[in-house]
Regions:
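Short, functionally important structural connectors and interaction interfaces within domains
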Residues: 6, 11, 22-27, 81, ...
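Intrinsic-disorder/low-complexity, polar/charged segments
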Residues: 8, 15-17, 175
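Short, acidic/polar
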Residues: 12-30, 76-79, 104-107
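Active-site groove signature of glycoside hydrolases
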Residues: 27-46
Length: 208
């Protein structure tokens, strides 16, 4: 909810009217009575958090939405919206992969880990770059993949799963073979040395 691409200028819309219309349309299109988790897609610079929060609470109260979360929210965006809601925000879907490592140190993961929120990682394979690029990072992914008998996608996913924030990768593929390969990430146990071996390559230098 919150993203509006059907107008002349692409924009965000977190008004109660747009959120309610989006939810009703989704329920109708999917033929269901309740949405498991509704995500506010991105921070809206024009969001009135009292209006948005009240609308989201009302959807939960009405049984149309089981839980509410966010996508691409920074901690301060999260706190602003949560301050105007009775129901808890339960998850934040953020960009996170070996190609986008900022959340490991910019406070995003620490914030959600502190409060016990579910973190979902979108683009966990770096938009496919980790599967096609040739670099020191992919070389290291391949070396671990060979040792573990999996492919580099599984290792890149295992890197996220090893974090104590209990990250849930969100896969952007319907390819059953790809999903099967990625599911083998659970077979990959990265110790601290191997985790930092990959992190170092993603960072481009040794850690300080």
């Amino acid at each position: 909810a919150g993203r509006h691409s059907g107008a002349c200028v692409k924009h965000y819309d977190t008004t109660a009217e747009h959120i309610n219309a989006s939810v009703d349309a989704s329920l109708s299109e999917m033929g269901i009575d309740e949405i498991d988790v509704l995500l506010v897609h991105r921070p809206d610079p024009l969001m009135d958090h009292h209006v948005t929060g009240a609308a989201l609470d009302a959807l939960v109260d009405a049984g149309k939405v089981r839980a509410v979360g966010a996508s691409n929210f920074r901690p301060w965006d999260w706190n602003l919206l949560q301050s105007a809601m009775r129901h808890p925000l339960v998850t934040n879907q953020i960009e996170l992969s070996l190609k986008h490592i900022a959340p490991f140190t910019n406070g995003d993961l620490a914030f959600h880990q502190q409060h016990g929120h579910l973190v979902m990682a979108w683009s966990p394979l770096g938009g496919g770059d980790l599967m096609t690029a040739a670099s020191e990072l992919t070389h290291r992914l391949d070396s671990i993949a060979t040792r573990c008998g999996v492919d580099r996608a599984a290792v890149a996913t295992a890197f996220l799963l090893a974090h104590p924030a209990k990250i849930t990768p969100v896969l952007g593929t319907n390819n059953l073979d790809r999903i099967s390969h990625i599911s083998s990430a659970e077979m990959v146990e990265l110790d601290r040395q191997h985790w930092f071996y990959l992190y170092e390559a993603a960072l481009g230098s040794e850690v300080p």
